[in-house]
Amino acid sequence: MALDADLEAWLRLSLIDGVGTQTLHKLLLEFGTPAGVLAASPRALAVVVPPRLASSITAGGASDEALSAVAAWLDDPANHIITLADSEYPQSLLQTADPPPLLYAKGRIGLLNQPAFAIVGSRNATAQGSANAEAFATTLGDAGMVIVSGLALGIDAAAHRGGLASRASTIAVVGTGLDSVYPARNRPLAHDIAASGLIISEFALGTPPLAGNFPRRNRLICGLARGVLVVEAAISSGSLITARLAAEQGREVFAIPGSIHSPLAKGCHALIKQGAKLVESAQDILEELGATMPQTPDKTAAAADGDDVLLAHIGFEPVDVQAICTRSGLAAAEVNAALTSLEITGQIESLPGGRWQRVH
């Protein structure tokens, strides 16, 4: 797809080697917009950044080849880039100290501004720990909270599975570019999340899983969420970093206790000693956050409302299910159910290749 001028300016600036989040914020504070930064004189830029970086900016920023790669990635209707200037940018991140200027996203971007809750923990989780994470995630998701985690093995993966099984779905925040999945063992899970949830990253396409990326990923996990639950964690677990960042951002921190003999309970016990709230059920979290389980809706009325919402996102040109999910923010299961209903009532028709179009 062709990049519009504003997005091209964001990309040309953000893809320059040496322009990280803090530097870009400084430049935007001084010059207003990415286009303003790129149009600035070397002398003006040198007041804010080192001369070598100023030269890279005045040379026009990132290469045309780099931008072409991003444009090709955006040809997939499930893929998005959201900037600080966009209305879709998550309001919860705007309240943090250093919100990423750009977010690369794959899936339902409407989830970014829904109430969210994070669940994290050990990569080497026990079977009970994984079961707890999945069960808590499903219950919290059914209460309307999008489940946020980091797509790691163990507790993260279980939390995502629970979120996918709930009515609210899940967001995976990753420490690589969105053109790869890390760890590779979670590729099927990532596929499911992209289809009915959302995967986001602040890192450019092609970014490998460098160790320094994951603390930055962790700050986004807790920045998106109203609170963070640590399910299992050793005393040296990265989940404790996430919990610390959450506390610094004013988020609630919760922990599930375990056996005094279990290494995977020591991190949770340390958090509880430091003031994290001990929880034994998802209801404990809901009560602390002032949330409640939703009332069972009238299914007939809800289905009719869902049909109307979906119809607004189907035009007279053929469109596939993934594109409809992206436009509407609905999960694939909801979309497929509504498509069947709309076809029965004669408002849309199915076409070869799994595509649909409006009839009248």
Regions found by a protein language model. Name each.
Residues 1-88, 345-347, 352-360:
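Short, small/acidic-rich helices and loops at N termini and domain boundaries
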Residues 1-5, 84-360:
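Glycine-biased, small-residue-rich flexible motifs in mid-sequence functional cores and linkers
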